[in-house]
Every structure is written in structure tokens, then in C-alpha cells.
């Protein structure tokens, strides 16, 4: 966002904080464990601790809202940010082959699984590394 968005868009969200819920859109899949879903508050724009570069830190699946502004305004801003992030200019495509491994840094990248491998199967293991608090 820092390089592609105008000054006005950056200024509008630079100090905003989001509510981030682990189960987010997937919460209804298992109501029994709802009380244990972790919540966190993160900045909309975070600074990568190694590179120092700025990155959007919102996600359709887990970001519920921008705090301290009306919900309709939050929804509109988030919709704009999600559409911005989904621009093909910001995407990397991975072509799976036998024994492929994909690894990315969630501090500056997101993934979106495409169900494009029918009739084949694809399996994966999620590895989460305990990291820093986004700033």
C-alpha cells in the first residue's frame, strides 16, 4: 500500500487499529470452541521487523472491523483495502508440481488457496512460528 496508494488513502488508515479474530469468517464451523477463539488488535499498516517496510495487515477471513470508527465506515474502508490487496499487480502465483513446498511470511504476504487441482488431491501442513507483535 505504501508504494501504490495515494497519500490520502495512507493517511486515512495509518493510525487505525483492527480487531482480528482467529476464526473470523470460519467461526460458524465449530460453535463449541467459540469461547476459545483468540482475539487480537493490530495496526492496519504494520512495519516488518526485519525489512522496515510497511504492509497492510488486514485479512477478509479474520479482520472483523476497524476500531473506534462507525461500523459502516469500517466496512467501507476494509472493502476498499481488500480490493486493493486483491489486485493482480500484488500477486505471486505458485504452480504446484510433485513435492512442491510453498512458504511465505505472513508479516508481509497473504495466501489464497485456489481449488484448481481437481481431480487430484493436495495436502498441506500449516506451520506457525511464534513471532513479534505487529507494530
Go through the PLM ranges and name each one:
Residues 1-101, 106-135:
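Non-heme Fe(II) oxygenase catalytic core, chiefly the N-lobe of the double-stranded beta-helix
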